[in-house]
Amino acid sequence: GGRFCDAMAASGKMKVLAVDYRLAPEHPFPKGLDDCVDAIEYAVRNSNRLNIDPAHISVGGDSSGGNLAIASALSDRCVGMIESLVLFYPVTKAFADNSLSWKKYGEGYGLDAEIMDVFNRAYAGDVDPYDERISVGMCDSKMLERIPRTLLVAAGRDILCDQGKEFAAKVGSRIMRIEFPDAVHLFITVPGQDKAFGESVSLATDFILNR
């Protein structure tokens, strides 16, 4: 979210590059992922011009952007390039997971199950939504070894809460998972959940800098 990127940049402690990746349904998988991987490679390749340290690249995103951040870290082209991930309520399964949170918060909590289904089908396009490059939570433990140290911030009242929790458990000790129990989906993007937003800025900043 642009407002979160602005807040991170305003800290004065890091450079922030916001990727304007192509969106579904006009540009289904893998177009958006390709754009993200291209951007990471660009940042590393042009680190001198951007005045950044290529050894300290963090990649982050919320919801579908969190999915793209994870998929970028898993891609062959980005192996070894990303020092850390910062994820907010990421999509890790691009299909109805029928978990408790999916059923309990599937309507009226910022992201409805019906809308999520439309988004998932639009992004997957002609590709199987269970494909590990789309549903990153389906990756096996060997593939997940590519995941760097990660901060995963969850919304407790969110349709995606349980799939994020399951993903964190699969990755293991490299993930720090923090949950705001009363928050709903999109709390870093849509104004109105100021406490969760403010604490997330601090959490993300500290996590990125305290390597």
Task: List the predicted regions and their residue ranges.
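Alpha/beta-hydrolase superfamily serine-hydrolase fold, recognizing
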Residues: 1-211
